[in-house]
Amino acid sequence: MWIADQWQDYELLDCGGGEKLERWDKQYLVRPDPQAIWETPRRLPEWKRANARYLRSQTGGGHWEKKALPESWQVRYKDLTFQVKPMNFKHTGLFPEQAVNWDFVMEKIRKADRPIRVLNLFAYTGGATVACAKAGAAVCHVDAAKGMVAWAKDNARLSGLSDAPIRWIVDDCAKFVEREIRRGKTYDAIIMDPPSYGRGPGGEVWKLEESLYPFVKLCAGVLSDKPLFVLINSYTTGLAPSVLGYLLHLLVAEKYGGTVSWDELGLPVTATGMALPCGATGRWFSE
């Protein structure tokens, strides 16, 4: 398991009973987590003193029950700064377990010692975009949600990257990649964080288990002659990490050589010393 254990502004204090207790800088949140199936005693007083708790409704969805919580605030990870804002469906705009991937891409870009062009797909609020740009890459950030792209721009600004070479694209990811192929554009690195389920602009159904292979195959068509890495994230519990590795072997490594690795992502749990699983990542890298 790749564990994001370098945080200072974020801490997973405890988890159990389908919930997790987190510290985001000075704010304490309780959020649902389907992986935390165990029942453990809630000894930490922050369980009761949390600034906000997300409560699921029996009809689907849910709502935040807030005591004293700012509308938004900032957290830092090393030299990166992000805006955190609790929103619908329990999310905060940041997945802290992704810090292990930010470290990975920053190291690869810095060691490459050449200009690197990165394509970040389903790029959300831009954690990976900011990491790549901070390491010196030119980034194309693509997400279908206009609000998420605006949030990502804000994260870039907070991290001192207002003038960095980042293209901000609001578009369907598959449609954008198809157009880039027609235009003859290539990238040295690709990052993708596709949803488990979604609908395209024409009502096309996206189901990760059925859509991921053809999508990765499509994306391989925009890789340069000397690619640096390809990274796939998945939060779909039905897909083992090794599935991501298998895809990368078939669609990237067989053409370019290099190395494929895969694993679960996790966050260390302060109360128990264990780690909470938070999805999976597959990585292909050349050097």
Locate each region found by the language model.
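Non-catalytic substrate-recognition/targeting regions of SAM-dependent transferases
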Residues: 6-22, 29-96, 103
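Conserved alpha-helix/loop element of class I SAM-dependent methyltransferases that forms part
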Residues: 96-114
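Conserved class I S-adenosyl-L-methionine
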Residues: 113-124
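Short beta->alpha hinge that forms the Motif I/post-I loop of the SAM-binding pocket
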Residues: 123, 143-147, 211
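Conserved SAM-binding loop of SAM-dependent methyltransferases across substrates and taxa
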Residues: 125-139
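S-adenosyl-L-methionine
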Residues: 145-191
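A short glycine-rich, Lys/Arg-flanked "PGG" loop and its adjoining helix->strand segment in the class I
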Residues: 210-226
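C-terminal catalytic and target-recognition region of SAM-dependent MTase-like enzymes
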Residues: 227-287
